[in-house]
Amino acid sequence: MKIILKENFETLGKAGEIVKVADGYARNFLIPKGIAAEANLRNIKALEHDKQNIVRKAEKERKRHESLAASLSGVTCTIARRVGEQDKLFGSVTAMDIEEALLAQNVKIDRKSIVLDEPIKAIGEFPIVIKLGAGVTAEIKVNVVPEQA
């Protein structure tokens, strides 16, 4: 089934594109959630009419993500954890911990956008990539320190 994307969808494409997907995926997920519309003649004509609006909305979203990335550059969050021998952490620092540390600094980031290849299990400073969307990423530093007893 051919559909018209109403908004950017990471696995399918950008808003305004016509893509082909499985019928069930379109009918049961994309169309009911308002992510896409069926690509019939009427909707294609409406798309041509609304294309300027879609492009403007996508550009506004990209600028918002870029300004957020600029505000995040240079941000360092410190997380204190109990350590054992050889500065090994008891447990690990996960995306949820980083999200909470950023919230304490009044920076609201969804933990799903924090990219961790694997949880942090050592003391030190680590660069962390945050995917903000629209192809925009930001990098912050996470400083893991031993907890004071």
Curated annotation (Swiss-Prot):
Example GO biological process: translation
Keyword presence, Transcription regulation: no
Pfam family, one: Ribosomal_L9_N
CC terms in the record's Gene Ontology section: ribonucleoprotein complex; ribosome
This protein's UniProt keywords: Ribonucleoprotein, Ribosomal protein, RNA-binding, rRNA-binding
Record InterPro entries: Ribosomal_bL9, Ribosomal_bL9/RNase_H1_N, Ribosomal_bL9_bac/chp, Ribosomal_bL9_C, Ribosomal_bL9_C_sf, Ribosomal_bL9_N, Ribosomal_bL9_N_sf
Alphabetized PROSITE patterns for the sequence: RIBOSOMAL_L9
GO molecular function, one term: rRNA binding
Record carries keyword Nucleotide-binding: no
Function noted in UniProt: Binds to the 23S rRNA.
Protein family: Belongs to the bacterial ribosomal protein bL9 family.
NCBIfam families: L9
Protein name stated in the entry: Large ribosomal subunit protein bL9
Annotated organism of origin: Syntrophus aciditrophicus (strain SB)
